[in-house]
UniProtKB/Swiss-Prot annotation:
Superkingdom assignment: Eukaryota
Catalytically driven reaction(s): K(+)(in) = K(+)(out); Na(+)(in) = Na(+)(out)
Main function: Upon acetylcholine binding, the AChR responds by an extensive change in conformation that affects all subunits and leads to opening of an ion-conducting channel across the plasma membrane.
Keywords: Cell membrane, Ion channel, Ion transport, Ligand-gated ion channel, Membrane, Postsynaptic cell membrane, Receptor, Synapse, Transmembrane, Transport
Protein name, UniProt field: Acetylcholine receptor subunit alpha
Subunit structure: One of the alpha chains that assemble within the acetylcholine receptor, a pentamer of two alpha chains, a beta, a delta, and a gamma or epsilon chains.
InterPro entries named in the record: Neur_chan_lig-bd_sf (IPR036734)
Gene Ontology CC entries for this record: postsynaptic membrane
Keyword Transmembrane: yes
Membrane-protein topology: Multi-pass membrane protein
Length: 24
């Protein structure tokens, strides 16, 4: 569902920020 995709995207975004803060 759309909500699920949004949730996964949000989770992935936060994960990337924590794991690779140098990327951005």
């Amino acid at each position: 569902s759309e909500d699920e995709t949004r949730l996964v995207k949000n989770l992935f975004s936060g994960y990337n920020k924590v794991v690779r803060p140098v990327n951005h």
